[in-house]
Amino acid sequence: MENYEACVGFDVCEIPLSAVAQKIMSAMRSGDFMDSRNEGESTNTSKVAKKSSVHYSVLAEHEETQSLGTKNPESLITQTPRGSIELCPQPSITKLTCQLSAGQVQNSISSLGLSSYLIPQCDQEASVLPNMEHKRQHFLKENIGKEDKDNSSLKRKYITCSKSSEKASKHTALEKDTDGTESWPNSRDTRALGERLCDVRYLGDLAKAQLMDALKQAAALVVTLMYKDGSTQLSAKEALTCTVKGIVVLLKSHVGNSTLTLPAHGGALEKDFISEDHCVYIHTEHSPFWDPKQEAHSLFVRNILFWTLRCKCPVVCFNAKDFVRTVLQLYGEDGSWKHVADFVGLDPRVAAWLIDPSDTAPSFEDLVAKHLEKSITVKPSSTFREASRNTLSQNVFMNLKILYDLTMDLCSKLKAYGLWQLFCTLELPLIPILAVMENHKIPVDKEEMERTSALLGARLKELEQEAHFVAGEQFLIMSNNQLREILFGKLKLHLLSQRKHLPRTGLQNQLSTSEAMLNSLQDLHPLPKLILEYRQVHKIKSTFIDGLLAYMKKGSISSTWNQTGTVTGRLSAKHPNIQGISKHPIKISKPWNFKGKEEETVTISPRTLFVSSEGHTFLAADFSQIELRILAHLSGDPELLKLFQESERDDVFSTLTSQWKDIPIERVTHMDREQTKKVVYSVVYGAGKERLAACLGVTVLEATHFLERFLQKYKKIKDFAQTVIGQCHSAGYVTSILGRRRPLPRICAQDQQLRAQAERQAVNFVVQGSAADLCKLAMIRISTAVATSPTLTARLVAQIHDELLFEVEDTQVPEFAALVRRIMESLQQVQTLELQLQVPLKVNLSVGRSWGHLTPLQEILGSA
């Protein structure tokens, strides 16, 4: 990522980085960025070329036709001292035009730069004719040296061009949108969307070669997806359901601190705005009609896009993951997903999230207002008139320049806050991994899912009828108000309870109908137990069964992964939320009228519905008690360290229970172990006494007693928590083991409840954020190993916080399992990040055809 660091004027980090980060850093020292000496030489070359170009330019000005020079238009490029092709500055009014209006002919040919080939202004349909390039060359040669040629001869040239375009216009009538409006940029009156946006579909072979050279020479690329409605990724609303029509790429000719002046709110770009940067439109929507030219265009576009994903220069993109996923969806069916593993684009949303993790989903407009202190409005265009196209192209061009400036500003802030290394090493390499995960589909057993949905639906009806019967009346079982009236108004169960303090609602201070309350009342009357089962069955059916069916496409599903969705650094998933699917099966009574096995109870496990592809096996790799191990490392508690540093033949939580309650380990019951586990994680997650009481099903006083006894046994944990809170009070933020930050402004609040909440969040973040860092690092290292392997084909399909789920070829399971174990457990010591944990990391591996039926892998595979 050296290109990215050079782009914002940073020095290469002195600390040795990971292989991925080193690759990033090495690019920043590459020759693609001109140093001051080379930049000066290139500038001189451009000046000489520009000066000579005046002799062979045709400028239409004040109704006078200027003469052409004697040079061949093929010489519109110059060789730099390094022997590479470099674009020269584009004059403000030099572009190829064939336009006749009001008896006046204006012909102009671009003297230098890519525009002579990228933005020809003849009628665009004529430009697609096979002989158009030859006609243009012939037109130029005929006019060389004829300074006093009569305008009528040029008029005849235009008429020939115009007649050809009329023939071609019949063909392009098929390319209209379904609403009857011609889809831009296929409009009849111009090949380009205004003066800023060029369509690569209409380039000849020479122009295509020049475009590829320009891409390779660009100091930076700024890209955005363009949707069918004319909006882009920079629009305020995310276009989750919009069809991608194309991709716009801004080629930055130089980098550095830009002094771009933004127009006033809602204002348009000035007409005379001149820039040396180039902006191209890459059409990706396929025509329903087969055409050899369409095939050639698709191949050219594929080459451009995959080169963009592998280029050395920085690629700036807002929501870069969506860009990578789109390219893979369009052209990545041949195993080319491995080629995008090296893509590390600069995503300003990720950068802004690292600076302020509480702002999890800002729009482009929000970030510009927040960090550049400018007000802009990104509006899609729904009309395709010439004026609208010009405005649209100027707006897209301008917004991409603003996006570049925004990203450079955020990169500077990352460096100032000490977050640049985390950005380069952890977050940016994760972008293509998440894109590949979204592009890969997980097969689902649809028939079993529909059968399970019917079974759960039948059971819900039975539970509802039973609840009405024991309540003595019908009521809405999902209505908390009606349930409260039955439980406490009619049945008076709160008066029968032996607990003095029953849970109440926060605002109205009414008796609660929460799970904790129902658990405390279920021995007093059958209704609370029925309500608990109804809620459990309803959640499984609505969320994990019917919810999955809603997102299923062609027998499989694929979640959307959010990199910036949490304040702790954890990943989140939606559509569907695969992370929320519990691994613990539930047992329900089988409906009396439901056909099937004769057992009285039925076991439901939503994870069993996820099945591996034919010839493949699921492999799950789970960090064992990673947060507890991090707590032991950070606190330095001798009892916890001893627990993990010695042989782990016994269960960790059983051993903790034995130590805490001072009982032999063989006398530890399952209930004792679960109680210890909940107490431990209440400390890790910063849960309050009330939350712990609800989890344990005890009073707040009892929960307080459990917590105090635990902290008295492991005193260093309490000392660690107090140290973290003190540091947060003084600095205003806390950090993870890899430097991730979370500002907590409420740590100094006058309100005691707000301050206590911030203190719990501080301790929680340090532990949970550190665990998230290690899990992300494991994802990156394993994905890199697979991408660089000539044989391994394993795909990461899901991340459930501490667990990574892979789909592996059956024959590769032993080799891949050994690789995964070695990489994940080696993260105990990462020299490149100056990380050295005091406790070992342990990984549990399990395999199976179904996600819900995984069996532990034999330990021998871990040492193979």
UniProtKB/Swiss-Prot annotation:
One of its GO terms (molecular function) is DNA binding. Residues 169-179 have a biased composition (Basic and acidic residues). Its EC number is 2.7.7.7. It is found in: Nucleus. InterPro entries: DNA-dir_DNA_pol_A_palm_dom, DNA/RNA_pol_sf, DNA_pol_P_Exo, DNA_polymerase_A, RNaseH_sf. GO terms for cellular component: nucleus. The keyword DNA repair applies. Residues 169-188 are annotated as: Disordered. Its main location: nucleus. Pfam families: DNA_pol_A (PF00476), DNA_pol_P_Exo (PF18049). Expressed only in testis namely in primary spermatocytes and in round spermatids. Belongs to the DNA polymerase type-A family. DNA polymerase with very low fidelity that catalyzes considerable misincorporation by inserting dTTP opposite a G template, and dGTP opposite a T template. Is the least accurate of the DNA polymerase A family (i.e. POLG, POLN and POLQ). Can perform accurate translesion DNA synthesis (TLS) past a 5S-thymine glycol. Can perform efficient strand displacement past a nick or a gap and gives rise to an amount of product similar to that on non-damaged template. Has no exonuclease activity. Error-prone DNA polymerase that preferentially misincorporates dT regardless of template sequence. Interacts with FANCD2, FANCI, PCNA, RAD51 and HELQ. This is DNA polymerase nu. The lineage of its organism: Eukaryota, Metazoa, Chordata, Craniata, Vertebrata.
